[in-house]
Design a protein with these regions (language model features):
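An alpha-beta-alpha
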Residues: 53, 72, 160-204, 209-210, ...
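Extracytoplasmic "Venus flytrap"
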Residues: 30-42, 51-71, 75, 79, ...
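Hinge/cleft segment of the Venus flytrap/periplasmic-binding protein
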Residues: 20-49, 289-352
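Hydrophobic alpha-helical segments within soluble ligand-binding/sensing domains
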Residues: 148-175, 220-221, 266-270, 285-306
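Hydrophobic alpha-helical
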Residues: 111-130, 196, 213-273
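N-terminal signal peptide c-region/cleavage motif recognized by signal peptidases
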Residues: 14-16
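Structural motif
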Residues: 36-40, 83-107, 209-230, 244-246
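Flexible loop/hinge segments that line or gate small-molecule binding clefts
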Residues: 119-155, 166, 267-280
Length: 352
């Protein structure tokens, strides 16, 4: 009888409060095998106890962070939360992000959601903040933040490496690959590289070069051009979404179908590339859903600081998808085509 009543309750619940499917790391770090969890999330914030959140992004100049942005905006509106968003201007803007951590305090925020520009360059600034800090997308050292939403970027690299390794196992003809992980020592790149290396270990794949650089189209295009010139017989080019997108364009201009292009993360351009057969495979860490989850996690723990892991998971993220075809429904991964950056939710023109 109890199970029947529960089933009826779930049917009657509006879709907006049904569970998120998440990977959950109860030991507090993005390592090892996560547990799959259906998490209902918090209830909307009562008007008598308003919450103001401050989110800091490395930048908003690519599809990845734009998709995170839309997810956060959607969830802030659903939960009735005031949200202010600041972008640092790039992964080199460490000083700017330190200043923005202080700005969140001066704006009267209740908590900070930090998309960090550095894994370990913000330790002192985070520890000095009087506000609870939540990790957003980019990992931070264990114990430094109250909780975090993201995925294992080691796993992102490993899954792409494994996809290739299964295609070219040991004993098959050798193939070459170039890796374009993005900026040196920033975001998830510290973890993608070793993950990819471990993923291809023991296979017929030989990594001939790793080309690191800022995630701007100009820099990634230059790196791709240099690599194609130095390795004209390259079999695979594996990189972040921007590297994959510019590689597709470069190959089209040169009327070449090699190297084959794979993307370690997702974007609108990568979705188009999969649809047209120009991108062979890609990961999606469902970044729009990460934005929703980050907002929901912060609200959950601000409402219930002593809650257990089942009620408010401290380290979680959406499952990583490895795709060989375009997503039929990309609304958990990509922002809408008409969406533009939003910096304020529930804040009037005067900033209040």
């Amino acid at each position: 009888m109890r199970s029947v009543c529960l089933s009826l309750l779930l049917i009657l619940l509006p879709a907006s409060v049904l569970a998120f499917e998440v990977d959950h790391w109860p030991d507090g770090a993005f390592g090892g095998q996560p547990a799959r969890l259906n998490w209902q999330g918090p209830v909307p914030v009562p008007v008598t106890r308003p919450l103001t959140l401050c989110a800091l992004y490395p930048h908003l100049r690519d599809a990845y962070w734009l998709s995170v942005n839309q997810g956060m905006v959607e969830e802030a509106k659903r939960l009735g939360v005031t949200l202010r968003i600041h972008e640092a201007g790039g992964y080199g803007a460490l000083a700017e992000q330190r200043q923005q951590l202080q700005q969140c305090v001066s704006e009267g925020s209740d908590a900070i959601l930090l998309g960090a520009v550095s894994y370990d360059g913000l330790d002192e600034a985070i520890s000095a903040s009087p506000l609870p800090v939540f990790g957003l997308v980019n990992d931070l050292p264990a114990g430094l933040v109250k909780a975090k939403v993201g995925v294992s970027w080691y796993q992102m690299g490993w899954q792409m490496g494994q996809w290739l390794a299964k295609r070219h196992p040991a004993g098959s003809p050798p193939v070459t690959v170039a890796l374009f992980p993005g900026p040196q020592a920033s975001g998830g790149n510290n973890f993608v590289e070793p993950g990819f290396a471990d993923g291809i270990e023991g296979s017929a794949i030989r990594l001939v070069t790793t080309a690191r650089g800022d995630n701007s189209r100009e820099i990634q295009r230059t790196l791709v051009q240099q690599t194609l010139a130095r390795h004209p017989d390259l079999d695979y080019l594996v990189g972040g979404a921007i590297a994959a997108e510019v590689a597709v364009n470069e190959l089209a201009q040169r009327q070449r179908d090699r190297p084959k292009v794979l993307s370690t993360y997702f974007s609108h351009g990568v979705q188009r590339g999969l649809r047209r057969g120009k991108v062979l495979a890609a990961n999606s860490d469902q970044m729009r859903q990460q934005g929703r989850l980050a907002l929901a996690q912060a609200v959950c723990l601000l409402q219930s600081p002593e809650a257990g892991e089942q009620q408010c998971p401290r380290v979680m993220g959406p499952p990583i998808l490895t795709l060989e075809a375009p997503l039929a429904n990309p609304t958990d991964s990509l922002s809408d085509g008409t969406f533009r950056p939003v910096y304020r939710v529930g804040v009037d023109a005067s900033g209040n």
